[in-house]
């Protein structure tokens, strides 16, 4: 029973993982969560794989040491860099990631088998999505790195002609490839979904991993009998803690736009320099 009452740990390089946190809150409203946005070290996209792995595992170490019952890597770049290491390192704590849920949804959604994937430089270069799609029959995958998208989202700029022009430039190869399904391979990108849809056209289905990741987490917690019991006392509500390794005020201003009243302040935490074990 004590494990059932433990919180769920979630982390991302910044605010992008809040799209995953929002879906988890919606689907698992009774669960306590601890979210860490690594704004002091992020964005992760331009970093090397060893740097991404070190930052990610340092945060994972911290969350697991605090007794989380599950760890959600709410970042495509981190998932592509350290998923295998994290699962070995933190076993028996289950680790849920964002790539496979998005792949499954895209395969189910496509009509012509031509699927686009956009992500950070590190995610696209890792080949993680290409590998994940390899088992899918009758699909052709086209990838494009969109490195500047994260910078705009982290600055709170999610609309305007400048961002639309950037999106049109990035996405032109995918339009020429006639993809009918586009995976938003970074948890920041759903915050630009309106612009991305406008650039791609209404006939293209956008796939975000947030809701599918929350479903995966629900499945894992159910299988391991780790779901938190619904409280008998209606005054007992879930505890949701949000932390940032960078400026907590800047993080709060951005996060409040996506979480609203769910967000009750952001705690500053020390910057994680790297994994030690």
Swiss-Prot record:
PROSITE patterns: ASP_GLU_RACEMASE_1, ASP_GLU_RACEMASE_2. This is Glutamate racemase. Substrate binds at residues 12-13, 44-45, 76-77, 187-188. It catalyses: L-glutamate = D-glutamate. Provides the (R)-glutamate required for cell wall biosynthesis. The active site is at residues 75, 186. GO terms for molecular function: glutamate racemase activity. GO terms for biological process: cell wall organization; peptidoglycan biosynthetic process; regulation of cell shape. Belongs to the aspartate/glutamate racemases family. Its EC number is 5.1.1.3. Keywords: Cell shape, Cell wall biogenesis/degradation, Isomerase, Peptidoglycan synthesis. Pathway: Cell wall biogenesis; peptidoglycan biosynthesis.
